[in-house]
Amino acid sequence: RYLLKPLVALFDKLIFSKVRENFGGELKFFIGGGALLDKNLQKFYVGIGIPMFQGYGLSEATPVISSNGPELYRFGSSGKLVKPIELKICDSEGKELPVGEQGEIVVKGENVMAGYWKNPESTAETVKDGYLYTGDLGYMSKEGLLYVKGRFKSLLISSDGEKYSPEGIEEALVE
């Protein structure tokens, strides 16, 4: 470990400092979303001194549901919930699941839309008792971090009833 310090310092001086300079030299961290961020890409940015944190949000509950930040982050996680959002994870019947179990991400808060413009049918399917059923698959960890795993509505069901996310299969194939 002690032998790595001089190498890291050398790489920082020759390479990483120039990358940071291309970002203006003042960037402390940045947050990405819109799709799941690649863990290796996140690790690269942490390594060069500009951490890339993953967040989660959607148009129907704008702008942010959860985010990692400098004080707490885990690769692969979408971070802690922003206040005052309520979040629960539900099964396909809408029953709340315990911490650690995967299901549909369901949110409630002042940021949740009232409904879709001139589309009461879609609104009734998506917003129930003030809760927005996002259609996204995820779980909450014991630490209170949200993990988004893919789309709940596009799950593949095996012959034994096990549910698989296409994104998880794609990730396994890429690795």
Specify the residue positions occupied by each region the protein language model found.
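Generic, well-ordered alpha-helical scaffold segments in large soluble proteins
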Residues: N22, G33, F44, I48-P51, ...
